[in-house]
């Protein structure tokens, strides 16, 4: 199945503690059906001190399920569903079903 959410996409969180927040996808994990989004779903982790890194409590992004994310419409930034379209030159591109604008390409 084609990927509806890709690295670098602007997404909106649909449910959970960070509902309504937007961020950029840092990493997609298709086997786990999860993604890392910059600035969303932050958790505190205790880090042991090493020669290169300082110890202490740090905040980092935790993975969030893809079903809780929606791609942001390029036109107005609101959540939209994603469709696929084949252009005249044969490329398969994603488009926002809300506005019809192309997401990539």
UniProtKB/Swiss-Prot annotation:
Name of the protein described by the UniProt record: Large ribosomal subunit protein uL24
Keywords per UniProt: Ribonucleoprotein, Ribosomal protein, RNA-binding, rRNA-binding
Gene3D superfamilies from the UniProt entry: 2.30.30.30
SMART domains: KOW (SM00739)
Domain of life: Bacteria
GO biological process: translation
Pfam families for the chain: KOW, ribosomal_L24
Disulfide bridge map: none
Family listed: Belongs to the universal ribosomal protein uL24 family.
Record InterPro entries: KOW, Rib_uL2_dom2, Ribosomal_uL24, Ribosomal_uL24_CS, Ribosomal_uL24_KOW, Translation_prot_SH3-like_sf
A GO cellular-component term linked to this record: ribosome
Taxonomic lineage from the root: Bacteria, Pseudomonadati, Pseudomonadota, Alphaproteobacteria, Hyphomicrobiales
Subunit structure: Part of the 50S ribosomal subunit.
SUPFAM superfamilies: Translation proteins SH3-like domain
GO molecular function, one term: rRNA binding
Role according to the record: One of two assembly initiator proteins, it binds directly to the 5'-end of the 23S rRNA, where it nucleates assembly of the 50S subunit. One of the proteins that surrounds the polypeptide exit tunnel on the outside of the subunit.
């Amino acid at each position: 199945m084609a990927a509806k959410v890709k690295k670098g996409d602007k997404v909106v969180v649909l449910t959970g503690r960070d509902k309504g927040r937007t961020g950029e996808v840092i990493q997609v994990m298709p086997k786990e059906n999860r993604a890392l989004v910059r600035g969303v779903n932050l958790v505190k982790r205790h880090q042991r001190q090493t020669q290169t890194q300082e110890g202490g409590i740090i905040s980092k992004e935790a993975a969030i399920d893809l079903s809780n994310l929606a791609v942001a419409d390029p036109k107005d930034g609101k959540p939209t569903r994603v469709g696929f379209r084949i252009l005249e030159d044969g490329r398969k591109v994603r488009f926002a079903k809300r506005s019809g604008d192309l997401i990539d390409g």
